[in-house]
């Protein structure tokens, strides 16, 4: 056993030199330190290298190095349209979530209507409608709804104010006058209706033959007399009730009376200082009225209204109260009242027996130009520069008919003796015929090539209609039928006034050419 151990030990000792390996020598650790600190030191000392000034500049230009303050992060100023839309939509949704919308569906519909949106869409329920309103309000803002409501309230209030009936409190004399007019007009209306019944009993053949004779006579009308009336244009002419005199008004301020049919000057009425708009005879003048009484009335552009007798060249009285132009004057059929139209958008009624203004009637939006009275004395018709006409009941003060249809100013208005037709002449070159019974326009006559200055029905039966215009002519139209019968041509200037004698035998026209003409059948 000892020998075996010795042999093994010896074997080991003999093998050791072959397997001997050199021991590993420990190398000391190398500490490089912080590269960041060294780089900072190198940069601080201004050393050149890869990351020197040139390298730093190249890195910044290449976009590999970003130098920031650490507090502010700069972004691109330009934002794409898509990004802007996304931001706007985000803000809109944010606003929409903050808007309170009523859960009452009727109120939601009212809000949509106020905003001018459809109150409902196809297949839309209350929830979808409410959401649609919310989205709309998020775009236009809730102030839009408030503004719309305020505008609606204002328009509603103004509409209520417009529809509100307002009036001037009239004097007691107006009440007395209304009662007097009612008592005056009712018997005349009964008489007119009785005459219409008697006329209807006349055989049709007789009436037709009479109408044919009248039309034949009208077609034969010729210029019987032409007279220079003044140095200035003649604005108005009017026959006396007995058809023996003709009154003319001139722009020189003079009014003249002429004999008919020889056209001799009888009187020159001096009193106006400016353009005279109209002169009219009293309904009973030259028939039953004393020549010393008031027989004529005239008006002028300075607002003056004067009353005249047949015995004096000076005015008998002045009617004061108009501050602007008075366009027309007209006597009531009774002769007690005088109507005046004024450019202050009103017309007035004067009681000459009481010597006071009893009615100051407004209703037109512009100046009132012409006035006419119904032959019964119950109604008055006015035509205004606002292109509208009105028919007034003098017994109650109400406007019973509104004449709407002309495109321009109304310069003439007249009632037919049949009691239910009204004719109006306008600046739109037409003459319209209105029916009081139907309360509408029944016919429009394309009468002239220039503005129509006057209209006049034949005063006995209203069998024809006369119109005058700025196209230098006057025309005669059948009634009924409204077909042209005769054109009265001869004036060298605008036809400014016209009239038909009370017996229906003569027609007078006056013109801008300073002449007046009488027309008579051969």
Swiss-Prot record:
Q: N6-acetyllysine (modified residue): where?
A: 27
* Family matches, as SUPFAM superfamilies: PRP4-like (SSF158230), WD40 repeat-like (SSF50978)
Instruction: Give the principal location in a single coarse category.
Output: nucleus
Gene Ontology MF terms in the entry: U4 snRNA binding; U6 snRNA binding
| KW Acetylation (keyword) present | yes
Q: Where is the composition biased (Polar residues)?
A: 1-13
> InterPro entries of this UniProt entry?
G-protein_beta_WD-40_rep (IPR020472), PRP4-like (IPR014906), PRP4-like_sf (IPR036285), WD40/YVTN_repeat-like_dom_sf (IPR015943), WD40_repeat_CS (IPR019775), WD40_repeat_dom_sf (IPR036322), WD40_rpt (IPR001680)
A single GO BP term for this record reads: RNA processing
- May I have one GO cellular component term? U4/U6 snRNP
Positions of the region Disordered? 1-20
**Pfam families attached to this UniProt entry:** PRP4 (PF08799), WD40 (PF00400)
The compartments listed are:
Nucleus; Nucleus speckle
**Keyword field:** Acetylation, Disease variant, mRNA processing, mRNA splicing, Nucleus, Repeat, Retinitis pigmentosa, Spliceosome, WD repeat
Q: Where are the WD repeats?
A: 229-268, 271-318, 321-360, 363-402, 405-444, 447-487, 490-521
Q: What does this protein do?
A: Plays a role in pre-mRNA splicing as component of the U4/U6-U5 tri-snRNP complex that is involved in spliceosome assembly, and as component of the precatalytic spliceosome (spliceosome B complex).
Tell me the subunit arrangement: Component of the precatalytic spliceosome (spliceosome B complex). Component of the U4/U6-U5 tri-snRNP complex, a building block of the precatalytic spliceosome (spliceosome B complex). The U4/U6-U5 tri-snRNP complex is composed of the U4, U6 and U5 snRNAs and at least PRPF3, PRPF4, PRPF6, PRPF8, PRPF31, SNRNP200, TXNL4A, SNRNP40, SNRPB, SNRPD1, SNRPD2, SNRPD3, SNRPE, SNRPF, SNRPG, DDX23, CD2BP2, PPIH, SNU13, EFTUD2, SART1 and USP39, plus LSM2, LSM3, LSM4, LSM5, LSM6, LSM7 and LSM8. Interacts directly with PRPF18, PPIH and PRPF3.
Q: What is the associated disease?
A: Retinitis pigmentosa 70: A retinal dystrophy belonging to the group of pigmentary retinopathies. Retinitis pigmentosa is characterized by retinal pigment deposits visible on fundus examination and primary loss of rod photoreceptor cells followed by secondary loss of cone photoreceptors. Patients typically have night vision blindness and loss of midperipheral visual field. As their condition progresses, they lose their far peripheral visual field and eventually central vision as well.
Protein name, please? U4/U6 small nuclear ribonucleoprotein Prp4
Organism placement in taxonomy = Eukaryota, Metazoa, Chordata, Craniata, Vertebrata
